[in-house]
């Protein structure tokens, strides 16, 4: 049985713009992870997204699409995650791109599991920070953004995105304490079971991505943190 997003504890994230061999893909899909998110920051095409989806459909694992590029939106996923970068310096990445996408493909997704993500980007050196012109935040501001996303906007997912850098566990814990209904996702720098375990003591869900392409065995080891 495929788990819904609000029961995920461990998730792998695959970038359609990056190559992954079939043996590695099989290892990821059969690792015991709760789900696989398909998404990336740039060079995301429909062909690459469809190819990755078709390859993943051979395995009994939930597959979600992060709808960050209109061109890559397609049917066939178990869930559709719609990211709004709350600390973006431009409305384009808070609401404009999302509205544009739903204008074009919203009719196709009307009966699908469409889930909003309130992204807070916390690594100023990451590509996603540059693309979205993310504003630098202090700890109090991070907590306030998360509380706004949770209690006012009622977003089902609040996502702390460190994108390649390991974040501050105490800040993740502070964010978790103010959430009333949203699920806290954490992504960034999880490259060992120890880091996975540490972040899972605070976040509801950890997202493991970059390490897949650098050290597959280390990535696979993180799944055991949920046991």
From Swiss-Prot:
Keyword flag Magnesium: yes
GO-annotated biological processes: glycerophospholipid biosynthetic process
EC number: 2.5.1.n9
Functional pathway: Membrane lipid metabolism; glycerophospholipid metabolism
Binding positions (sn-glycerol 1-phosphate): 13, 159-164, 189, 209-210
GO-annotated molecular function: heptaprenylglyceryl phosphate synthase activity; magnesium ion binding
Residues that hold Mg(2+) according to the record: 15, 41
Domain of life: Bacteria
Enzyme class: transferase
Cofactors required: Mg(2+)
UniProt keywords, alphabetically: Lipid biosynthesis, Lipid metabolism, Magnesium, Metal-binding, Phospholipid biosynthesis, Phospholipid metabolism, Transferase
Reaction catalysed by this enzyme: sn-glycerol 1-phosphate + all-trans-heptaprenyl diphosphate = 3-heptaprenyl-sn-glycero-1-phosphate + diphosphate
Alphabetical list of CDD domains matching this protein: PcrB_like
Assembly, per entry: Homodimer.
Chain's role: Prenyltransferase that catalyzes in vivo the transfer of the heptaprenyl moiety of heptaprenyl pyrophosphate (HepPP; 35 carbon atoms) to the C3 hydroxyl of sn-glycerol-1-phosphate (G1P), producing heptaprenylglyceryl phosphate (HepGP). This reaction is an ether-bond-formation step in the biosynthesis of archaea-type G1P-based membrane lipids found in Bacillales.
Family from the record: Belongs to the GGGP/HepGP synthase family. Group I subfamily.
PANTHER family for the chain: HEPTAPRENYLGLYCERYL PHOSPHATE SYNTHASE (PTHR40029:SF2), PTHR40029
Protein name: Heptaprenylglyceryl phosphate synthase
């Amino acid at each position: 049985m495929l788990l819904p997003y609000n029961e995920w504890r461990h998730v792998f994230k695959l970038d359609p713009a990056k190559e992954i061999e079939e043996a590695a893909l099989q290892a990821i899909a059969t690792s015991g992870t709760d789900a696989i998110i398909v998404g990336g920051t740039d060079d995301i095409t429909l062909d690459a997204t469809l190819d990755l989806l078709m390859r993943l459909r051979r395995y009994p694992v939930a597959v979600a699409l992060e709808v960050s590029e209109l061109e890559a939106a397609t049917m066939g996923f178990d869930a559709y995650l719609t990211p709004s970068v709350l600390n973006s310096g431009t409305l384009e990445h808070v609401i404009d791109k999302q509205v544009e996408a739903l204008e074009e493909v919203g009719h196709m997704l009307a009966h699908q599991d469409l889930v909003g993500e309130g992204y807070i980007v916390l690594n100023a050196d990451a590509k996603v920070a540059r693309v979205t012109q993310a504003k630098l935040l202090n700890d109090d501001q991070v907590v306030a953004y998360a509380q706004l996303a949770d209690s006012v906007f009622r977003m089902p997912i609040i996502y702390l995105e460190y994108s390649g850098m390991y974040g501050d566990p105490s800040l993740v814990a502070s964010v978790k304490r103010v959430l009333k209904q949203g699920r806290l996702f954490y992504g960034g720098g999880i490259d060992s079971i120890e880091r996975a375990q540490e972040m899972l003591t605070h976040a509801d869900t950890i997202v493991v991505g970059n390490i897949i392409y650098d050290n597959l065995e280390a990535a696979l080891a993180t799944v055991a943190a949920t046991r």
